[in-house]
Design a protein with these regions (language model features):
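Acidic/histidine-rich, surface-exposed loop or edge segments in extracytoplasmic proteins
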Residues: 31, 58-67
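Active-site regions of metal-assisted phosphoester/phosphodiester hydrolases
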Residues: 9, 20-56, 90-93, 97-257
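Bacterial N-terminal signal peptides
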Residues: 7-16
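Charged, glycine-enriched surface loops/patches
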Residues: 79-89, 109
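Short, flexible/disordered intra-domain loops and linkers
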Residues: 66-77
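Positively charged n-region of N-terminal signal peptides that target proteins for export
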Residues: 1-4
Length: 257
């Protein structure tokens, strides 16, 4: 009888494990341009992010110990480190440029361990601001590893954005993991550069405007994935009631199979 009970227990455990594997990993992904904290405090950002309980957050316009005249309340703040501390998440930072006595760049927060990360500089013509990508391998609870990429593309010229998109596609083409790409692309959906991304990447967001928060007129913030067949989109939303920045946060909840 004991052997029968043990066999049944093992059987149910196996079925449960198979079911969990079939369901995949449910992830809540966020992309948020912080506008270097000019319009809100670091504590307000931390409180908002914590309230959403995201699994991974891509952050753009992140200062590191700068001294800006436009944001004196943020002087000396190491944004990504402090957001990671106050939200209880892992955090990594990628410097794009030296600025105002510190650094300016992009960051990533993750509920799960970040196994590896790198900052990679994007093409630049020497006339525009240096941009970068932050590439992180993240281990999910079941042991699966995904690669999450955060970026903030050139704002002034479409030519540079096109070169940057081409670079990103080429740089990531041999990645063996499920890929996610999020950030402020500084381009609306129907531009050539966004069409180039959609040739290989699936857009996990809707077309609700993300900028400017005081008078929304355009969508420039996105979350993408590839290969598309491995990811199921459950819901996506632009948080139009959150006005801590000039951008709205973009959130997509997905299942990664």
């Amino acid at each position: 009888m004991k052997r029968l009970v043990s066999f049944i227990s093992i059987l149910f455990a196996s079925v449960a494990l198979l079911s969990a594997t079939e369901k995949g990993d449910t992830l809540k992904l966020m992309s948020y341009n912080l506008r270097f904290g000019e319009l809100a405090s670091m504590e307000q950002f931390a409180q908002y992010i914590s309230s959403e309980q995201p699994d991974i957050v891509a952050l753009q316009e992140c200062d590191w110990a700068t001294k800006r005249t436009r944001a004196p309340h943020q002087n000396g703040v190491r944004f990504v480190n402090e957001l990671a501390y106050h939200t209880g998440m892992f955090g990594v930072y990628g410097k794009s440029i030296n600025y105002a006595g510190g650094y300016y760049g992009i960051g990533l927060l993750s509920k799960y361990p970040i196994l590896r990360f790198e900052r990679v500089l994007l093409p630049n013509d020497g006339k525009t601001e240096q941009r970068s990508i932050l590439v992180a391998d993240i281990e999910l609870p079941g042991g699966k590893v995904i690669t999450f990429v955060n970026t903030h593309l050139e704002v002034k010229t479409a030519k540079m954005r096109i070169e940057q998109v081409e670079f990103i596609k080429e740089y990531l083409k041999d990645c063996p993991n499920q890929l996610f790409l999020a950030g402020d692309m500084n381009a609306i959906p129907d531009t050539k550069e966004m069409e180039m991304l959609r040739e290989e990447w699936n857009d996990l967001t809707n077309r609700v405007f993300t900028y400017h928060s005081s008078r929304p007129e355009i969508k420039i913030d996105y979350i993408y994935t590839k290969p598309a067949e491995n990811v199921e989109l459950l819901c996506t939303e632009v948080k139009e009631d959150v006005k801590l920045s000039d951008h709205f946060p973009v959130i997509s909840t997905i299942v990664s199979h």
